[in-house]
Regions:
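Catalytic core segments in nucleotide and nucleic-acid processing enzymes
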Residues: 2-224
Length: 224
């Protein structure tokens, strides 16, 4: 990751991250990062760089990207729809980053389904493989709709079904919203990286009240 450290030192990463809040900065971003990529793709790329510093530079960032990189390690095309934008595997944890420049209203239409699907499928995949790794998704955007924030929290309270194998379910899916400015601050907290992720999981712990997956069917049978 010497390329990242040389072209994108910490302060440059912060500077670039701050530019996304104003779309008049699009040309600056393309000029510095990649003229061949969309600004949305560049956002995924820069979010990864910020996370690299938050993680204390210990992750293999370039292999964690699901976006397409050029021979010069410049972003070209954003991640495809079947997988998360950035998936970081470590011995004890898997962190998935889902980054979007959609505004708070558009996120409901464009992000709720794929982010949830990717998060559920990744967690179930890890459970099937018996890895025992902690799985966390961070949903990163410049702004959030309050319903988006609360929907992600509520998801942890109910069993979720795999879209790959309908026989498989998982619980306590963790999707934590973090905005761009908050991520920028976190880049200076690499010594707290593991603790912060553990704290996120504690925040999402819910009481398991034996959620009944057949609640709707049972009710409908009574009224129809």
């Amino acid at each position: 990751d010497e390329f990242i450290r040389q072209k994108y030192p910490l302060e440059k990463g912060k500077e670039l991250l701050a530019l996304f809040s104003n779309r008049t900065n699009d040309s600056k971003l393309k000029e510095y990062v990649s003229t061949d990529a969309t600004v949305s793709t560049i956002y995924e790329f820069v979010v990864g760089i910020a996370w690299y510093y938050f993680a204390g530079k210990r992750i293999d960032l370039l292999s964690s990207y699901n976006l397409t990189l050029s021979a010069n390690f410049e972003p070209l095309v954003h991640a495809g729809g079947g997988q998360g934008d950035i998936v970081i595997y470590e011995d004890d944890k898997v962190v998935m980053l889902e980054a979007t420049l959609m505004n708070s209203s558009s996120q409901k239409r464009g992000e709720w389904e794929p982010v949830l699907r990717h998060s559920v499928n990744l967690k179930i995949e890890e459970e099937i493989n018996g890895s025992q790794r902690q799985v966390t998704t961070f949903f990163i955007a410049d702004e959030f709709d309050s319903n988006t924030i609360n929907i992600w929290k509520a998801v942890a309270a109910v069993p979720m079904q795999s879209s790959v194998d309908r026989e498989n379910f998982t619980e306590n899916v963790v999707i934590m919203p973090i905005n761009s400015s908050e991520l920028s601050v976190l880049t200076d907290k690499s010594d707290e990286y593991d603790k912060i992720i553990d704290d996120v999981h504690s925040l999402f712990e819910v009481e398991k009240n034996n959620f009944d997956l057949n609640w709707r069917d049972e009710f409908i049978r009574k009224i129809v």
